[in-house]
């Protein structure tokens, strides 16, 4: 299921948009389980013709998937100050922890 159309992005099918929603439809929940998306999406970056010749980094920090290292329990255990350091913190803990639990069901 692609969110990329001939005229732009269909936000109703955009994984990044869906992961940021507080209330998801059963279809959106199923899509997140199927794709394993927890927060955001890099598909647009990967298919963009402007990025076709981009060099890959050897810096481990950028090569590893940060989301793969997260667990709902680790996020819940963070202090408010530590949680605030993450880009997704503006959305609140519940959205990200629910997404993680949904993917791991």
Regions found by a protein language model. Name each.
Residues 1-16, 37-39, 43-62:
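Iron-sulfur cluster-binding cysteine motifs and their immediate structural context
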Residues 3-27, 65-73:
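Active-site-proximal loop/short-helix segments
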Residues 26-34:
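Short linker/helix segments within small regulatory modules
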Residues 68-87:
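Flexible internal linker/loop segments at domain or repeat junctions
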Residues 36, 88:
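Conserved aromatic-histidine-acidic binding/catalytic patches
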Residues 81, 89-105:
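Long, compositionally biased charged/polar accessory segments in the mid-to-C-terminal portions
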């Amino acid at each position: 299921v692609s969110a990329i159309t001939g005229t732009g992005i269909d936000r109703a099918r955009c994984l990044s948009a869906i992961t940021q929603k507080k209330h998801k439809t059963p279809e959106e929940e199923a899509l997140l389980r199927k794709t394993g998306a927890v927060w955001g999406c890099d598909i647009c970056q990967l298919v963009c013709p402007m990025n076709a010749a981009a060099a890959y980094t050897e810096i481990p920090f950028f090569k590893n998937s940060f989301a793969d290292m997260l667990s709902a329990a680790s996020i819940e255990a963070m202090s408010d100050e530590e949680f605030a350091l993450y880009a997704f913190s503006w959305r609140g803990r519940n959205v990200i922890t629910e997404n993680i639990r949904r993917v791991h069901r």
